[in-house]
């Protein structure tokens, strides 16, 4: 079967939910038995989002093969079974970097390098490479139509549609249809102008996804179809919903998947959305509730912890609980004290970088340990838990990480100088290494110690989880900390790197060096998050007695 391409663009304003719409359509097509993948093309000049501020860009999602990518790839993996790879996300910066590398190498035989054809050809080549082996590939273009940054991508997709044939391509455009209270009606003019902008660069959309706070009336959909030269059945109303997991059913109810299959002449069974119905049922019928305190430094933008937020919700589904997240700035713990932690049923310290707010996180771990509050530490959340235990229990009063104090006398956490990547190649790092693309990244095996919380939750000896860090537990000082009672319950494949620690004589205190949030899904959840939320609920029941 030839690969079919769905190109997703957005107009009028940003943040309309192109990623969610693309992932939801992919989920329906997957439920029809098709092999689907999704790609994200980002117009910014950064090579990848690895060094971008989380408060500007949101979280960095790490793929199985170690690519640092846009957070939308997290949505893709939560909606479909296909795992994303480095092929599923690339930026303008990465495209230009590769074209310039080829030019320096002489690949273009002295040609004058131009946006057309060299940049557009590189974009097309990457899209085609990422689509290999799939029935349908959905390609989302970041940004808004009309932005100068996205023009090379749109031109490349226009060319690709001609190259592979319009019978194998479909353009889906998301647009805003605002409701004006004073007029008492929705307005279609922004959509018409957005489509006009697309037409000016040679793209005629085949499907319009109309975002609004309400369903678009049939007469307005007919008007949009007429003025935008789109079939009326291809004008889809996408209203605001309580849960993003309602969107697959909402799109299916309007026949979007049927339209796509007919367009590509695909014969496949009806979509079975039973799993999504079960997710929604659990979400709508919780048997209890818990409040999780998330202590971090990027709390002003929840998207900075997008996968953690979603993983907590998934754990709620697994336990039939409603999970409320209380965001706590770690600097507030430093300035206002542990009073800001009162009233939560469990405490989670997610990953992060840099010194700001670290002492607040260390005090948070101490508070959770001493007050028997369920604690889950992720990446930096494990490192600060280790520092706290070393200082206050193991007698290493000057314990710290060399990330925060390069002249630390007792560096219980230090820079990884050498390790093997997924392909077995030796990676070497120093303090002088670039920040971008120089971490321990991607899926790594971990061996679990029997009798531990981790082993009980996972139910197996060897697991695989994704990493994103450049500092590790210092094995030189580890024996003294273990002697004081801390349990190392997870080790890397070569048994040299600490992956999981647990505090004994505590209801639930588990911290891991990897990022379990990246593999949590609404249908399957994740063992560590499920165990953590369950323990938080047990703590909640004690507190209300």
From Swiss-Prot:
Domain Glutamine amidotransferase type-1 per the UniProt entry, residue ranges: 291-542
Pathway(s) the chain acts in: Pyrimidine metabolism; CTP biosynthesis via de novo pathway; CTP from UDP: step 2/2
EC main group: ligase
Gene3D superfamilies, A to Z: 3.40.50.880, P-loop containing nucleotide triphosphate hydrolases
Binding residues for CTP: 14, 147-149, 187-192, 223
Active-site residues (renumbered): 379, 515, 517
Region of interest called Amidoligase domain, as start-end residue ranges on this chain: 1-266
Binding, UTP: 14, 187-192, 223
Keyword tags: ATP-binding, Glutamine amidotransferase, Ligase, Magnesium, Metal-binding, Nucleotide-binding, Pyrimidine biosynthesis
EC number: 6.3.4.2
Keyword Transmembrane: no
One GO BP: 'de novo' CTP biosynthetic process
Residues given in the record as L-glutamine binding sites: 352, 380-383, 403, 470
Other known facts: CTPSs have evolved a hybrid strategy for distinguishing between UTP and CTP. The overlapping regions of the product feedback inhibitory and substrate sites recognize a common feature in both compounds, the triphosphate moiety. To differentiate isosteric substrate and product pyrimidine rings, an additional pocket far from the expected kinase/ligase catalytic site, specifically recognizes the cytosine and ribose portions of the product inhibitor.
Family, similarity comment: Belongs to the CTP synthase family.
Protein name: CTP synthase
Organism: Haemophilus influenzae (strain 86-028NP)
Encoding gene per record: pyrG
